[in-house]
Amino acid sequence: MAEAEESPGDPGTASPRPLFAGLSDISISQDIPVEGEITIPMRSRIREFDSSTLNESVRNTIMRDLKAVGKKFMHVLYPRKSNTLLRDWDLWGPLILCVTLALMLQRDSADSEKDGGPQFAEVFVIVWFGAVTITLNSKLLGGNISFFQSLCVLGYCILPLTVAMLICRLVLLADPGPVNFMVRLFVVIVMFAWSIVASTAFLADSQPPNRRALAVYPVFLFYFVISWMILTFTPQ
């Protein structure tokens, strides 16, 4: 170890001492913690979730997903301001609703292509293309909602119109006439308004206050087109 230089004032009596000898007098305060744990709660939670889902059976996975879809259906049927659809988004519910609606709008006759009736692929494309267009419009207006969250909300809010389509199919089993049309018109208008209220309840707060009208207007057109296809549907 290097030695310190002798004192110039008293060269005869100075004795060499270690250069870092004074460091031994430094003490650490008892109030300062010198040990602890480094934990990352979020990663550990994600790791536990992954391990739990990997170890569960296929039946439990399907039932868990169906319960989640059912809860989101209830949020649409009883619309209120909530972040459930935005926080726990999925596309299973919108896919089920879109396929169901497209199947019910499919005409029974083999000549439905010639009489102008909507085909399965046409309905499927209209629904998803419309949802994507509204989502891009929302992002361009400065909305703080992600792409898939918007698709999830718009898809789940088709539920009232799907119910309207089911009711209209049942009404069409009776003899056609003015009363038949008025009943279908009333059902479609009510379910159309229901879809608008449900979607705006989830999406309104995600838009800037001065641009909410610009964001809601395409949603109105989107559900109006679907409602028009339902109202003008005839089985033959």
UniProtKB/Swiss-Prot annotation:
Disulfide bonds: none
GO molecular function: identical protein binding
Record's subcellular location: Golgi apparatus membrane
Transmembrane regions: 85-105, 116-136, 147-167, 185-205, 213-233
Modified residues (N-acetylalanine): A2
Keywords: Acetylation, Golgi apparatus, Membrane, Phosphoprotein, Transmembrane, Transmembrane helix
PANTHER family named among the record's database cross-references: GOLGI MEMBRANE PROTEIN YIP1 (PTHR21236), PROTEIN YIPF6 (PTHR21236:SF1)
Complex formation: Predominantly interacts with YIPF1 or YIPF2, but may also form a ternary complex with YIPF1 and YIPF2. This interaction may stabilize YIPF1 and YIPF2.
Protein name per the record: Protein YIPF6
Provenance organism: Homo sapiens (Human)
Lineage start: Eukaryota, Metazoa, Chordata, Craniata, Vertebrata
Gene: YIPF6
